[in-house]
Regions:
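Loop-to-transmembrane boundary segments
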Residues: 64, 154-182
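Intrinsically disordered, low-complexity segments enriched in charged and polar residues
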Residues: 33-41, 72, 76, 83, ...
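Membrane-interface amphipathic/juxtamembrane segments adjacent to transmembrane helices
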Residues: 23-79, 88
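Hydrophobic alpha-helical transmembrane segments
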Residues: 1-12, 173-179, 184-210
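Short, charged cytosolic
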Residues: 127-158
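Charged, low-complexity cytosol-facing tails and large interhelical loops of integral membrane proteins
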Residues: 59-125, 129, 230-366
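Transmembrane-cytosolic junction motif
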Residues: 17-43, 210-237
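Composition-driven recognition of long, C-terminal low-complexity regions enriched in serine/threonine
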Residues: 67, 195, 199-211, 219, ...
Length: 366
């Protein structure tokens, strides 16, 4: 292999690393490509020791970013906050004894990490929780209900995505051109037509600067409270052609981070994809040990979004069919079993349900 070929492979390998999206393992990741728009990405490579998962964005033109949404596992109610302990047990913390702190991308309750995500999202939750601590019980109840309604507002998430699509048009065009300049024009100039090398380098650098300027403008519109993050990202894009190619990734990744996955799915998914995601999220909310108050409010709002898409929520709570020989199923993940058992081997849910209508799976016993 020639030196030019080796250099090309090294640069392309670095570019592939740039295409990796690092998220919390509990995040839901959507693709925004022309062919797979709204498709939920299958589970990425999970690094359990680092509490991180890796998802690969489409590296080749037409470039498309990934959309990440991460709903917090902590559950708020007017009297307390419910979190999961190290062994999955529920722990309740009263508002009077709750101490909320943050460390970078982590949110902590009384020193225990309860959420890891986008720094802007963590800051927003920290401010919300501080306000709730100082509120009276009626005020707290109204504020939590408002927060849940906003998180399940599919129209608001759709509007935010539309703003991104409209404002990022030039970024999407120029970043695809930058891919061509860096991986086709520049190697051609180096290996075949050296007289083009200086103009090619100038073109790559100028394109990175243009993308950085446009990124600053769009980011300021979409993320008004993240000046430090905006400066760092703009500086990186201006100096690194590889980062410049993935400018849309930086803009889009946390665009709807504060919205529930069902609200985002309702805004971008096909009917079939939405049904799968909505059913998964509805079952998780309904059959996960939780504060009764929080569970009732969250499930009610999820069901409302499902009905707005013309689906009946109850139909998403049972398997579409009963597999041959199966007598039980898990109401949370719909895994079916041929023998009696006490808990689901896939998700750990303990209250398995017996089929009561042979071959249909449409009826269940609570």
């Amino acid at each position: 292999m020639t030196e030019l070929g080796s250099l090309f492979l090294i640069v392309f390998a670095l570019y592939i690393v740039q295409c990796v999206c690092w998220v919390n393992p509990d995040s839901v990741v959507f693709a925004l490509g022309l062919r797979d728009r709204g498709k939920k990405k299958s589970r990425g490579l999970t690094l359990s020791g680092l509490d991180t998962a890796a998802f690969l964005a489409n590296p080749l033109p037409p470039l498309s970013p990934l959309l990440v949404t991460h709903w917090p596992a902590f559950q708020l109610n007017p009297d307390s906050v419910l979190i999961s302990g190290p062994n999955g047990e529920a722990t309740s913390i009263t508002w009077e004894t709750l101490v909320v702190t943050r460390s970078g991308s982590r949110l902590l309750f009384n020193g225990t990490s309860v959420f890891k995500g986008d720094e802007t999202q963590v800051l927003g939750y920290c401010q919300l929780l501080q306000q709730l601590r100082q509120a009276t019980r009626p005020q707290r109840e109204r504020a939590i209900e408002k927060w849940l309604r906003e998180g399940l507002d599919s129209k608001a998430s759709a509007r935010r995505l539309q703003v991104f699509q409209r404002r990022s048009l030039w970024i999407r065009i120029v970043s695809n051109l930058q891919f061509f300049f860096l991986f086709f024009l520049l190697p051609f100039a180096i290996g075949i037509y050296p007289r083009m090398l200086r103009p090619a380098i100038i073109l790559v650098v100028a394109t990175s600067v243009i993308l950085a300027i446009e990124f600053w403008s769009v980011h300021r519109k979409l993320y008004k409270k993240t000046a430090d993050t905006r400066f760092t990202a703009t500086f990186t894009i201006a100096l690194s052609p590889l980062a410049a190619i993935r400018t849309c990734d930086t803009l889009c990744r946390n665009l709807v981070a504060g919205y529930h996955p069902v609200a985002v799915a309702a805004a971008i998914c096909t009917d079939a994809a939405f049904e799968a995601i909505a059913g998964e999220q509805l079952r998780y909310a309904k059959f996960t040990s939780a504060s009764d108050w929080y569970q009732k409010k969250l499930v009610g709002l999820i069901e409302q979004v499902i009905r707005q898409r013309g689906l009946e929520p109850r139909r998403l709570l049972t398997p579409s069919s009963q597999m041959s020989g199966c007598i039980l199923y898990c109401p949370r993940c719909l895994t079916q079993y041929v023998t009696n058992r006490e808990e689901c081997s896939d998700c750990g849910h303990k209250a398995l349900v017996a089929f009561t209508s042979s071959g249909t799976g449409t009826s269940f016993s609570p």
